[in-house]
């Protein structure tokens, strides 16, 4: 019978579709969907359990309850298919039509749809240009609204209270019409002529001056245009007919004990039907107005509750005081349709179990318990058993498997061979959380996992569980084997480094083997080959750490694959010689001839992958692991309490620190330092004491003195187990050893502040009660943090994935010449990240020239691999322009050249790769390692921030960047520009260090001078801000009147007097308008000019400036005319960790943002107002000047008369990304966000490639604001997708019309996700109601471009292996041919086929 049904299945086929459109349903459309009107609130008959007629489960409307059987039982069986029973009116067909047939309710009075009423901004309100409150008062029958004023003085849409209405009736009689309720709103909406409104508003727009009014009209215009273009009619926002959901989607399930469980929707529908029927009866009876009104209001409320319960007023609750789940609740939220059933489904053929170690497995294998395998591969086993003739029927096969006869196991072995399974560990934070393995059958019940893949899964064996999934189809097996096999995922997609690096015991074993010791057994022997070494080791002639000489044979592999062998003698140890046996051919012996810590091993694997490729690396990684386990066992490393050696110096160091603290305490009590300073200093003292103790401890641990062969004492690296574990990177760190053998150190309170009494004891000595309490205090905070962090990190990842999910590589090369300028990252003089690491795997955007010549070193469009990077480094190139996804020109995707290398594969990225998701996972996955805390900058850092000089670390030459300077009387340079930087260049022209130097810095060296390491080359006063003279002459005071604009103050200690300019607020009224200044005059008494300009040398003095010179005093170039004291910058918290990353990606505005210059020009200060000063910038080309009000308390970086460039910092603070984009452009904002995000991750030692952050930034920059519409169909001030505007502009330019101009906009990731073109994707992310309301009103069509939309509608995603399928479809839709659908048979053909089959079956009896 099952086979027969196949013929009938083809009746209802899903049409191929290319998009999904959402719109408003008209009453006629709703009626056309419906199969009948639901008139009664009954559900099923309580005795017969049959559905009531015309009720909510009526079989006549919705279809039969049993397959091919009418309700009264007159027609049963297949042969009556399609007949409608004359007794009960039920069509004989399959039950599943009850999942798709809808009904309807004819409403006795129209009802407003709550989504279009209450979802802000209210669409109905915007359409009618009325406030939401007014409309609600009409809808809920509190006031009348005028619909047709006629010849009266009333206006259309005017609100009338009951009294007003009665007065108007008396006055005008029936000349006017006013109504209440949804009917009134319906008539108002129906009366709107969309086209006329649009024309009126478009004419009105240009003449409007008020900003708010323009915004309001633009909003309304957009809405009306959306209606007009989509063909929706405004009156459809009011329901006249209510559709009824098919009954099987709101089932009534019998529980045991005769009770029923029902879906909340049934209650809600029942309520609507009851009220509707009562209203019909009242209308028939012509009941009094007030009763009818009340009933209509109740109907409106019950429909509201059905559509979106709790949106207005209190939510309707069921019998158990729980709000009922309405239609809107069904689709939104984590438990809603989108996230629960469409994006995350449960799958069949899966199992889960605890994992244990499989140290004997190969990298591509996993151990699968026989029991699990038998269950998972059942259908395959049945098939095999039947195929081999061991079982006659499936039923027999089933019996065999249940009895577990021996043949079954042989078959299972066969089935499993070369059939990969997928292992997944939750939480799956990145794509390496699911990998494929070949199963190996094992006894027991735990899955065995290869130790090297633990890092990718972040798994350990303390009870973690993993899930197994079986890829069933051939295609799935192929993908699992070729793409997801653990051996194909050696490199991490986040940073391109090996992710299958050994850890813990393996590292310890390899490290132990490769160490050397003085005077080991067999030291100084020389061996002819590695085989001999092994023999000596096995026969115990030579110890594993002994230093020996040995002849090694190395294979070099040339570019073309030719192999040459060479031999040489190396100094090494027995252990390293043994390790080199597993080294693949083609790698140098030097790679193992060193202490093999975790970093070295990782580098070794990386080199192996780059030089020899995947296969050798996989084999090598396995061998390394086996060797590591073996030698770790041999080493017998263990930890005893005596391994934690406490340094003798500890006690004196602690005593010294305590004495210092006492001294500060005394200073505090005598009032010399403030409480804050005392606290900071105390913490500093303890922090440095802690450092010293741990230094002494590590020095003590790390070396030991032994007797060498000559009988003399010699220092050697210690073989202390704890030290070895930390040094090799196997487990633990100096910070942890410090707590065991040094001192526990400072602890933090739960709020993050540091407790000033540290724990001076360590764990070996033991803690006393108060120390123990403080310890637990901090530890508990750590646990609470971790729990919060996980949730926050997961949410960040979800937002990132959502914003980037539809970004896919869709073409080879977009041909752009744009790119980002890459320089080495230098912080405080150290190169944090050399240029090589930043450009590796990128494509060059413009030819790189050899320094000092015109010769092209790296041609454009070269993919920089390791070899090219070597060339770049040799030629000491310190900046280059590389392609980036941010500047990629491809529409709706990116090109391979702008992305560069696929980090996980090491070649240029393939088309169809979902780079957006990879980027989001790479940024989100380490999120759990980031801290949650904001860092309190305590003493140490605040002291560092008040630096006052630059001390060089390397030899080199001095170079200045964007610096203006003058030479003072003693021949030193004085910097007179802001944001100047000073760099040190080595002899090859590479930049080694770079420092920011403030205005007024005095340089000890001239530009291009040689500097030595450790020299101090620049000084400045961190506490005051000088005003430097740029010419020599005499001082002339302007507007400097004692007691009016300035005062004289005498210093008590030195007796010197100085002039202090008064703040505007303190001056008498005569001085309010005066502008105190210093003017420089020459010997002839005329004003001097600033060199090279026509600007007189006049320096305006702000309030509180201190002038050291007197009137008419001579002055030299570079001397300070005045000093402005700087308030000591308050120690402010810097947000760090996860919250900082989230803030950057959400593009949040900082609390006190830096103020940037909006234009280039000259600064002057206009009239001051209360609490604010007016900053005026006059452009050099004489354009309109720009004014801005700035609060007085902001510290300004600029003086009157100074020139600024657009985007320069005027007042310090955190820079807002929006400002950087507006004033400095897209590349600068990209650099800013990339560097800021990287700073957070770098602090935690996490490496992420810049590319991933750039991908997210590209998505944040997707939208733009139209500044001038030109001849396009956009509106000025409208937000649009950049790709759309570019495409439109290309068309306009081709026609010779004026294109639209636009300004890029930066959106935070949440906003950007909600602003995508695809409403399905946005609705499944957040704010489902709002997204769907907006989409419906605009009649939006979702083209199913992204990944998420396709997952939701159940198709292959347009990325990876599904990419070509989508390419083919798109090409066909473009040319107009249809993809071949499944063969469709008409019902009559199917019936014929069936009859034939039945005859055959019948004749074979």
UniProtKB/Swiss-Prot annotation:
UniProt binding sites for Mg(2+): 460, 462, 464
Catalytic reaction annotation: RNA(n) + a ribonucleoside 5'-triphosphate = RNA(n+1) + diphosphate
Keyword Metal-binding set for record: yes
GO cellular component terms, semicolon-separated: DNA-directed RNA polymerase complex
Binding site for Zn(2+) 1: 70, 72, 85, 88
Keyword Transferase: yes
Gene3D superfamilies xrefs: 1.10.132.30, 1.10.150.390, 1.10.1790.20, 1.10.40.90, 2.40.40.20, 2.40.50.100, RNA polymerase II, clamp domain, RNA polymerase Rpb1, domain 3
Enzyme Commission number(s) from the entry: 2.7.7.6
EC top class, as a word: transferase
UniProt: Zn(2+) 2 binding residues: 814, 888, 895, 898
Entry-linked InterPro entries: DNA-dir_RpoC_beta_prime, DNA-dir_RpoC_beta_prime_bact, RNA_pol_asu, RNA_pol_N, RNA_pol_Rpb1_1, RNA_pol_Rpb1_3, RNA_pol_Rpb1_3_sf, RNA_pol_Rpb1_4
Cofactor(s) this protein requires: Mg(2+); Zn(2+)
GO terms of molecular function: DNA binding; DNA-directed RNA polymerase activity; magnesium ion binding; zinc ion binding
Assembly description: The RNAP catalytic core consists of 2 alpha, 1 beta, 1 beta' and 1 omega subunit. When a sigma factor is associated with the core the holoenzyme is formed, which can initiate transcription.
Family classification: Belongs to the RNA polymerase beta' chain family.
Name of protein: DNA-directed RNA polymerase subunit beta'
Gene: rpoC
């Amino acid at each position: 019978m099952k086979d027969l049904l196949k013929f009938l299945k083809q009746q209802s086929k899903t049409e191929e579709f290319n998009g999904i459109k959402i719109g408003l349903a008209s009453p006629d459309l709703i009626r056309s969907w419906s199969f009948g009107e639901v008139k009664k609130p009954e559900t099923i008959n309580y005795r017969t359990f049959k559905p009531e007629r015309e009720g909510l489960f009526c079989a006549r409307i919705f279809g039969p309850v049993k397959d091919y059987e009418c309700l009264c039982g007159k027609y049963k069986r297949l042969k009556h298919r399609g007949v409608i029973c004359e007794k009960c009116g039920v069509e004989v067909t399959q039950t599943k039509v009850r999942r798709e047939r809808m009904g309807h309710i004819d409403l006795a009075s129209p009802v407003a749809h709550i989504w279009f009423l209450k979802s802000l901004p209210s669409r109905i309100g915007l359409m009618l240009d009325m406030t939401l409150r007014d409309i609600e008062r009409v809808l809920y029958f509190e006031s009348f609204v005028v619909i047709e004023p006629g010849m009266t003085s009333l206006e259309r849409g005017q609100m009338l209270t009951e009294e007003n209405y009665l007065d108007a009736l008396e006055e005008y009689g029936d000349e006017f019409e006013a109504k209440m309720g949804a009917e009134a709103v319906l008539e108002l909406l129906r009366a709107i002529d969309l086209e006329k409104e649009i024309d009126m508003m478009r004419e009105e727009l240009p003449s409007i001056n008020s900003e708010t009014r323009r915004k309001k009209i633009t909003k309304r215009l957009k809405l009306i245009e959306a209606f007009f273009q989509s063909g929706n009619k405004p009156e459809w926002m009011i329901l006249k007919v209510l559709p009824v959901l098919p009954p099987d989607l709101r089932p009534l399930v019998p529980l045991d004990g005769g009770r029923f469980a029902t879906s909340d929707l049934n209650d809600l529908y029942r309520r609507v039907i009851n009220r509707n029927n009562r209203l019909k009866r009242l209308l028939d009876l012509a009941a009094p107005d007030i009763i009818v009104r009340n009933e209509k209001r109740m109907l409106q409320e019950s429909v509201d509750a059905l559509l979106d319960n709790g949106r207005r007023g209190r939510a309707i609750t069921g019998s158990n005081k729980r709000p009922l789940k309405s239609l809107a609740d069904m689709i939104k939220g984590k438990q809603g349709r989108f996230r629960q059933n469409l994006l995350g489904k449960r799958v069949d053929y899966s199992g889960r179990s605890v994992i244990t170690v499989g140290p004997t497995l190969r990298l591509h294998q996993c151990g699968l318990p026989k029991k699990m395998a038998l269950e998972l591969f059942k259908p395959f086993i049945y098939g095999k058993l039947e195929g081999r003739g061991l079982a006659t029927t499936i039923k027999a096969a089933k019996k065999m498997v249940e009895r577990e006869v021996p043949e079954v196991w042989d078959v299972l072995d066969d089935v499993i061979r070369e059939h990969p399974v997928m292992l997944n560990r939750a939480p799956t934070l990145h794509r390496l959380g699911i990998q494929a393995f070949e199963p190996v059958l094992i006894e027991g019940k735990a899955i065995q996992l290869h130790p090297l893949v633990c890092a990718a899964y972040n798994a350990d064996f303390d009870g973690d569980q993993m899930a197994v999934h079986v890829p069933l189809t051939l295609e799935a097996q192929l993908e699992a084997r070729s793409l997801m096999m653990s051996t194909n995922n050696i490199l991490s997609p986040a940073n391109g480094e090996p992710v299958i690096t050994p850890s813990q015991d393996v590292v310890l074993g390899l490290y132990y083997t490769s160490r050397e010791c003085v005077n080991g057994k067999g030291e100084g022997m020389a061996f002819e080959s590695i085989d001999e070494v092994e023999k000596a080791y096995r026969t115990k002639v030579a110890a594993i750490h002994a230093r020996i000489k040995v002849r090694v044979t190395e294979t070099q592999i040339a570019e073309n694959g030719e192999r040459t062998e060479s031999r040489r003698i190396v100094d090494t140890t027995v252990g390293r010689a043994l390790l080199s046996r597993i080294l693949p051919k083609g790698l140098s012996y030097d790679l193992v001839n060193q202490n093999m810590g975790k970093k070295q091993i990782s580098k070794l694997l990386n080199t192996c992958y780059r030089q020899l490729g995947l296969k050798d690396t996989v084999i090598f990684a396995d061998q390394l692991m086996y060797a590591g386990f073996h030698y770790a066992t041999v080493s017998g490393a263990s930890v005893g309490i005596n391994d934690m050696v406490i340094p003798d110096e500890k006690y004196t160091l602690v005593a010294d620190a305590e004495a210092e603290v006492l001294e500060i305490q005394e200073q505090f009590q005598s009032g010399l330092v403030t409480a804050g300073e005392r606290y900071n200093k105390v913490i500093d003292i303890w922090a440095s004491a802690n450092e010293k103790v741990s230094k002494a401890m590590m020095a003590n641990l790390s070396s030991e003195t032994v007797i060498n062969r000559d009988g003399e004492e010699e220092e050697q690296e210690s073989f202390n187990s704890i030290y070895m574990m930390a040094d090799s990177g196997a487990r633990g760190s100096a910070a942890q050893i410090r707590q065991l053998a040094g001192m526990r150190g400072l602890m933090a309170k739960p709020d993050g502040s540091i407790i000033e009494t540290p724990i001076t004891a360590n764990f070996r000595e033991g803690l006393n009660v108060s120390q123990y309490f403080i310890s637990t205090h901090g530890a508990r905070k750590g646990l609470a943090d971790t729990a919060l962090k996980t949730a926050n990190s997961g949410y960040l990842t979800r937002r990132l994935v959502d914003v980037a999910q539809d970004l896919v590589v869709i073409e080879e090369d977009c041909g752009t010449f744009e790119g980002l300028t890459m320089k080495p990252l230098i912080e405080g003089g150290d190169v944090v990240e050399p240029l090589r690491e930043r450009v590796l795997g990128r494509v060059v955007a413009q030819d790189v020239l050899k320094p000092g010549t015109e010769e092209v070193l790296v041609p454009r469009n070269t993919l920089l691999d390791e070899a090219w990077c070597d060339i770049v480094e040799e030629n000491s190139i310190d900046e280059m322009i590389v392609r980036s996804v941010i500047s990629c020109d491809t529409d709706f995707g990116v090109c391979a050249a702008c992305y560069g290398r696929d980090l996980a594969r090491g070649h240029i990225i393939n088309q169809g790769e979902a780079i957006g998701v990879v980027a989001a996972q790479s940024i989100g996955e380490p999120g759990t390692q980031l801290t949650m805390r904001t860092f309190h900058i305590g003493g140490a850092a605040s002291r560092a921030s008040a630096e006052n000089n630059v001390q060089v670390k390397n030899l080199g030459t001095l170079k200045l960047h964007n610096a203006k300077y003058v030479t003072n009387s003693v021949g030193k340079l004085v910097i007179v520009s802001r944001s100047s930087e000073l760099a040190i260049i080595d002899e090859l022209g590479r930049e080694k260090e770079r420092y920011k130097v403030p205005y007024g810095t005095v340089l000890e060296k001239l530009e291009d001078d040689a500097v030595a390491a450790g020299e101090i080359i620049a000084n400045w006063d961190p506490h005051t801000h000088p005003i430097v003279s740029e010419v020599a002459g005499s001082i002339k005071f302007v507007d400097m009147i004692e007691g009016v604009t300035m005062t004289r103050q005498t210093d008590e200690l030195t007796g010197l007097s100085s002039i202090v300019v008064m703040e505007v607020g303190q001056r008498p009224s005569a001085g309010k308008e005066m502008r105190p200044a210093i003017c420089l005059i020459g010997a002839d008494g005329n004003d001097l000019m600033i060199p090279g300009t026509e600007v007189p040398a006049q320096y305006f003095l702000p309030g509180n400036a201190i002038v050291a010179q007197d009137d008419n005093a001579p002055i030299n170039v570079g001397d300070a005319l005045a000093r402005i004291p700087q308030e000591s910058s308050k120690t402010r918290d810097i947000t760090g960790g996860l919250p900082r990353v989230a803030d950057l990606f959400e593009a949040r505005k900082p609390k006190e943002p830096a103020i940037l210059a909006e234009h280039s020009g000259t600064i002057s200060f206009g009239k001051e107002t209360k609490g604010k000063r007016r900053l005026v910038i006059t452009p050099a080309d004489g354009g309109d000047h720009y004014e801005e009000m700035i609060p007085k308390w902001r510290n300004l970086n600029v003086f009157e008369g100074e020139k600024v460039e657009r985007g320069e910092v005027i007042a310090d603070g955190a820079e807002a990304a929006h400002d950087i984009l507006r004033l400095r452009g897209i590349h600068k904002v990209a650099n800013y966000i990339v560097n800021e995000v990287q700073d957070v991750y770098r602090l935690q030692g996490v490496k992420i490639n810049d590319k991933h952050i750039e991908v997210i930034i590209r998505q944040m920059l997707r939208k733009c604001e139209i500044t001038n519409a030109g001849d396009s169909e956009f509106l000025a001030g409208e937000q649009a997708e950049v790709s759309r505007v570019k495409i439109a502009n290309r068309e306009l330019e081709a026609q010779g019309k004026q294109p639209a101009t636009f300004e890029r906009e930066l959106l935070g990731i949440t906003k950007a996700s909600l602003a995508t073109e695809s409403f399905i994707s946005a609705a499944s992310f957040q704010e489902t109601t709002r997204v769907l309301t907006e989409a419906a009103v605009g009649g939006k069509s979702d083209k199913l471009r992204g990944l998420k939309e396709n997952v939701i509608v159940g198709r292959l995603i347009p990325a990876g292996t599904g990419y070509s399928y989508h390419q083919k479809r798109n090409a066909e839709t473009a040319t107009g041919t249809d993809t071949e659908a499944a063969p469709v048979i008409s019902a009559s053909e199917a019936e014929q086929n069936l009859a034939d089959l039945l005859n055959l079956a019948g004749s074979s009896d």
